[in-house]
Amino acid sequence: MVHLGPKKPQARKGSMADVPKELMDEIHQLEDMFTVDSETLRKVVKHFIDELNKGLTKKGGNIPMIPGWVMEFPTGKESGNYLAIDLGGTNLRVVLVKLSGNHTFDTTQSKYKLPHDMRTTKHQEELWSFIADSLKDFMVEQELLNTKDTLPLGFTFSYPASQNKINEGILQRWTKGFDIPNVEGHDVVPLLQNEISKRELPIEIVALINDTVGTLIASYYTDPETKMGVIFGTGVNGAFYDVVSDIEKLEGKLADDIPSNSPMAINCEYGSFDNEHLVLPRTKYDVAVDEQSPRPGQQAFEKMTSGYYLGELLRLVLLELNEKGLMLKDQDLSKLKQPYIMDTSYPARIEDDPFENLEDTDDIFQKDFGVKTTLPERKLIRRLCELIGTRAARLAVCGIAAICQKRGYKTGHIAADGSVYNKYPGFKEAAAKGLRDIYGWTGDASKDPITIVPAEDGSGAGAAVIAALSEKRIAEGKSLGIIGA
């Protein structure tokens, strides 16, 4: 008997036979609107490469292409104990990372909840004091206070900051609900180091990093086939190693000990790709999301691919279908009319609904929005969620294909992290299929030359590996960034 392998799981979605013609017509229209074919993807990739290159010029472009000041590849042999901190919107994460020197590491971590009003305190010292006190608590917990050697620390600071060297970060503007005066325009490293020193903690901040660059470096440490770090979450971003000679905007700004063939990690911040709307296949719903956003005309790519906007797209389509008199008739939709009431967990849960009658979807709409749905309506909603999620995945991989083509990568691993990548049903498969369609690969998908794989912990292990590389440069007396920085 021929062994055919495991049976495919039964398709969850039932037949569309009971869906009225007027709703089926809408489903077909939505399919036409949200489906992105291979030819369109390739067109997007071509323009993406142009914009990546433009971002490296002195004049610049839509994509910032920020040098990350990591100028070596990890060897995987880096070893020792390092601290990493990650300042998020609600928690501070403190991590002790033990690099073993054989491409592996161990981590021990604690989370410290930010006091409710900390993000808007009028006294910036309170934030740095809180972080330093948390570090002290962690040092006591881990019995590290009496360590003879100074512990190098990598600081993951995922807020817009300009860097002229690895161990500085001048905050451009607060995001994620922070609004603390007298920090924007200042280097955050000495602000924190000052509070650490006041407490006589044996810690030195040697690197300030972006989480996407951290994802690239942590994954490269364990897997030298890593070509990129990417985030598919509330935002979208990518990081990769370019070569100094290709970064025109650094011409004449680097010391002689940074040769032109030196690698340089680049934090793309490519959520702003195609702000002119030249190639992205926007629907009227994407236009509405943009126009109603706090910054119209900005972050065009992010608004079509990131988790932050997927639920909002779903909400806008449903409201329009209701206005046409096609569904959710004669009901109070006041809750559904609140912008961003549907976060990404909604389309994710709807796509994951295991029941033939889409019972979970029915519960979601009744309990959370006070709205009753018919089975045909739920089938339309489910199909719409699939379309929005699949489109996001297919467009999101255009950034990957563009960087791989720009750098001439024919094979390799793309290390991915973020809530959408990790939790959104079908996203990984749709992303892999998107890459296959761009490149025209056929045959066994597991043998694809470029594959997206789960990333290592960028803001913890990545910060630690970068701290190790930075510490080595400091010890060797090498420059850490722009001349005079």
From Swiss-Prot:
Domain of life: Eukaryota
Keyword ATP-binding: yes
Record-annotated Hexokinase domain positions: 21-468
Entry-linked Gene3D superfamilies: 1.10.287.1250, 3.30.420.40, 3.40.367.20
Pathway the protein contributes to: Carbohydrate metabolism; hexose metabolism; Carbohydrate degradation; glycolysis; D-glyceraldehyde 3-phosphate and glycerone phosphate from D-glucose: step 1/4
Binding site for substrate: S158, T175, K176, N210, D211, N237, E269, E302
GO cellular component: cytoplasm; cytosol; mitochondrion
E.C. number(s) listed in UniProt: 2.7.1.1
Keywords: Allosteric enzyme, ATP-binding, Glycolysis, Kinase, Nucleotide-binding, Phosphoprotein, Transferase
Chain positions with Phosphoserine modification: S245, S272
PROSITE patterns linked to this entry: HEXOKINASE_1, HEXOKINASE_2
Catalytic reactions on record: a D-hexose + ATP = a D-hexose 6-phosphate + ADP + H(+); D-fructose + ATP = D-fructose 6-phosphate + ADP + H(+); D-glucose + ATP = D-glucose 6-phosphate + ADP + H(+)
Signal peptide boundaries: none
Activity regulation (record text): Subject to allosteric control. Substrate inhibition by ATP.
Molecular function in Gene Ontology: ATP binding; D-glucose binding; fructokinase activity; glucokinase activity; hexokinase activity; mannokinase activity
UniProt: ATP binding residues: 86-91, 111, 307-308, 344-348, 419-423
Hexokinase large subdomain: annotated span: 210-457
GO terms under biological process: D-glucose import; fructose import across plasma membrane; fructose metabolic process; glucose 6-phosphate metabolic process; glucose metabolic process; glycolytic process; intracellular glucose homeostasis; mannose metabolic process
Protein function: Catalyzes the phosphorylation of hexose, such as D-glucose and D-fructose, to hexose 6-phosphate (D-glucose 6-phosphate and D-fructose 6-phosphate, respectively). Mediates the initial step of glycolysis by catalyzing phosphorylation of D-glucose to D-glucose 6-phosphate.
Subunit structure: Homodimer.
Entry similarity comment: Belongs to the hexokinase family.
Other known facts: In yeast there are three glucose-phosphorylating isoenzymes, designated hexokinase I, II and glucokinase. Present with 40800 molecules/cell in log phase SD medium.
The name this protein goes by in its record: Hexokinase-1
Species assigned in the record: Saccharomyces cerevisiae (strain ATCC 204508 / S288c)
Protein encoded by which gene: HXK1
